[in-house]
A protein has these predicted regions:
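Membrane-proximal basic amphipathic "stem/tether" segments
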Residues: 1-50, 55
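Active-site and donor-binding regions of nucleotide-sugar-utilizing enzymes
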Residues: 47-136
Length: 136
């Protein structure tokens, strides 16, 4: 294989790489547009707070302690997002709503929560509105 063939192969790989990234970016922009349209019809509840720790993997870290502090105040509706919410029956007995990460219920609570407390990054395809506060 000569140098020209190697360069051509690399260009093809780069083109594929750029095409994949561009496709992902287009999908992300389309999803944000759809969710922004949906968010227009879902009112933000001033007393609702959505929590998530480590992309929904557990009830831990700063979000846990913030929610533990706030659960004593009945004026707030606390929602937790988990990859698997079944093991968290104790939270439900305490009046905390648990939802499955990525479910329709999760998207509803995400769009309707006044405050979003995550210890990781927001999903790139989900917009926050001007009425929402994101705490990381």
């Amino acid at each position: 294989m000569n140098l020209r063939e190697i360069k051509n192969k690399l260009r093809k790989v780069k083109a594929v790489y750029l095409a994949i990234n561009f496709g992902g970016l287009c999908a992300q922009v389309a999803a944000r547009t759809v969710f922004r349209g949906i968010a227009f019809f879902i009112p933000v509840k001033k007393n609702r707070i959505l929590f998530r720790a480590y992309e929904g993997r557990g009830y831990t870290c700063s979000p846990k302690y913030i929610s533990e502090y706030m659960k004593n105040d009945d004026t707030y509706e606390i929602v937790w997002s988990f990859n698997n919410p079944e093991p968290y029956d104790e939270l439900r007995r305490q009046g905390i709503i648990t939802v499955k990460q990525g479910s329709l219920q999760y998207f509803y609570y995400y769009l309707s929560s006044k405050v979003i407390v995550f210890n990781d990054l927001l999903e790139a395809f989900l917009p926050t509105t001007g009425n929402q506060v994101y705490i990381n």
